[in-house]
């Protein structure tokens, strides 16, 4: 589960991390409160969406102007102008689709005198089963680009779960970030604070980009991105309450109610598959033949007729879907159950796009018979390659 920057900063501040004063803005009526609360003379007006690259992003609406989703204001009137330009409009970044994300919230905070920008994140290292700090002197940049172009500028520090962040660990991080003086002293305090927040709140990732050294020599968390382990939310009702459902696709929210693994994408071919590996292979082969998947949808191994029908109807709610590929390998999942669910959903939705079904595994003959005798216009496929070619051909007309 992801949260907004302002929520992440409030959480980190509660653990003792140094963050700037700021005011969340949910409507234009909140802007004056921010102006009255924050002294200036520099304010930063930030779009709050669940996507990175906001500063370099562009708004779709012309009235939002040419600037990105993070803007500096040197007087109170500019604070108001930037807020009016951004709130309610759609921001496109490198991490959004071409349709962008609507900016429903802003965060207005005090500006900072920046001397140096650094990168710091905490994550679970799957290879070592430890929590690890990943740090770099190249802050404020796309860390993936740094990893690709100059991997030697990134250092990973493994943390012993029995000891936590030791003075030796903190010294390694300080050395990697070339910190000295007050900044190094701040680091000795900050790293254990961030680690404690990460562990106690069951975070999946904590990214501070940038972590800045200010001109007075002290550290500050300038931007923060936090995601949580969804499986642990039952232990943290305070964290679960931070969820902003407007940031999620409505189809994804409905899929979650059915315990379906569904992710909306930008293509035109809807996919319903059982098993994450098979789902990814299905999307890959669709791309291989020149089209794009409209979604990732894994119905799981033990889905019943109702769950299958629900998945099908969720896929159909995407207006970009021009065809659907059902690709099922029946192990625990039975092909006849899939067939019954698909038929029920097709009848309820009055399907008007091509449908290709590939079934293999448990009760496959019965499943094929059910589809064949349904009288519906379903295109059968013998294998995955055949299915992909048929749905691509059908979509292209």
From Swiss-Prot:
Any one Pfam family match given in the protein's UniProt record, by short name: Ligase_CoA
Root EC class: ligase
Region forming the signal peptide: none
Residues that hold Mg(2+) according to the record: 209, 223
Record: residues binding substrate: 274, 331-333
Ligand binding (ATP): 46, 53-55, 109, 112, 117
Sequence ranges assigned to domain ATP-grasp in this UniProt record: 9-254
Record field: catalytic activity: succinate + ATP + CoA = succinyl-CoA + ADP + phosphate; GTP + succinate + CoA = succinyl-CoA + GDP + phosphate
GO biological process terms, semicolon-separated: succinyl-CoA metabolic process; tricarboxylic acid cycle
Keyword Mitochondrion appears in the UniProt entry: no
An annotated Gene Ontology molecular function: succinate-CoA ligase (GDP-forming) activity
Pathway membership, UniProt: Carbohydrate metabolism; tricarboxylic acid cycle; succinate from succinyl-CoA (ligase route): step 1/1
Cofactor(s) needed by this chain: Mg(2+)
Functional note: Succinyl-CoA synthetase functions in the citric acid cycle (TCA), coupling the hydrolysis of succinyl-CoA to the synthesis of either ATP or GTP and thus represents the only step of substrate-level phosphorylation in the TCA. The beta subunit provides nucleotide specificity of the enzyme and binds the substrate succinate, while the binding sites for coenzyme A and phosphate are found in the alpha subunit.
Protein name: Succinate--CoA ligase [ADP-forming] subunit beta
Organism (species): Hyphomonas neptunium (strain ATCC 15444)
The gene coding this protein: sucC
